[in-house]
Amino acid sequence: MRFDCFAQNLHDMSVLKHIWGDVERHFLASTSCSGLSFPGLTTVNQSQISIRSIVPNMAQLFSYTACRQLSQMFLAVIFFHGSEYILAVGIHGRSNVTLKSLLISKHYLLAMVFSLLEYCVEIILFPGLKEHWWISNLGLAMVIIGEIIRKMAIITAGQSFTHLIRTHPSEHHRLITNGIYRLVRHPGYCGFFIWSVGTQIMLCNPISTIAFALVVWRFFAQRIPYEEYFLRQFFGSQYEEYGRRIPSGVPFVK
């Protein structure tokens, strides 16, 4: 008997819920058609509608697209910085290498966090934006190419390659003009520029792609002339002649 009463109550509540839903829909339709406005009620319903439209899209964060693109991003970042540190230890020795060789700074972390936030917001609000696989694959190719160019630069230069600009000559420092350095003067910078922009194209992040390109380019546009001032001091006419023949490797930087 109690079970029958409980079932009847559930049935009545379900009927009332449907009736209330119909009444609410008809009421909102009539007020919108008649031009009546109820600011508080309208605001609440608009917020509910917007939330209801966003919440289902939260699942996009766990979709195949997000898992693939984000995993590629994390693997690219881990490999880049891990290999930088390993090569630095192998070339210069453990005692001469610090955690700065990982090339991770506060500004770099902020940029990466911003790019991830952009990705999460866009895949929730505009999931179709991330489905342009030819763009994402182009970015992946840029990441691989940039990685190869930079690592070739490090291996070719050997002990002449450091993460800090030399302001004083060293016994191990010599002018490298062979290998990848026959094509560009600063293949390490060229590789990083391609790699960093490629990570954002791989994520189909339009805002971060432009931001990364501008910020990284501006950094190298200031760094290269400063570094080459000392290279001319160290190698004189030899570097002057090399600089005239070979491009810098960074677009629009002589």
Regions found by a protein language model. Give the residues of each.
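Membrane-anchoring alpha-helices and their flanking helix-loop junctions
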Residues: R2-T177, I194-K254
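Histidine-centered phosphotransfer motif of kinases
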Residues: T177-N178, R182-C190
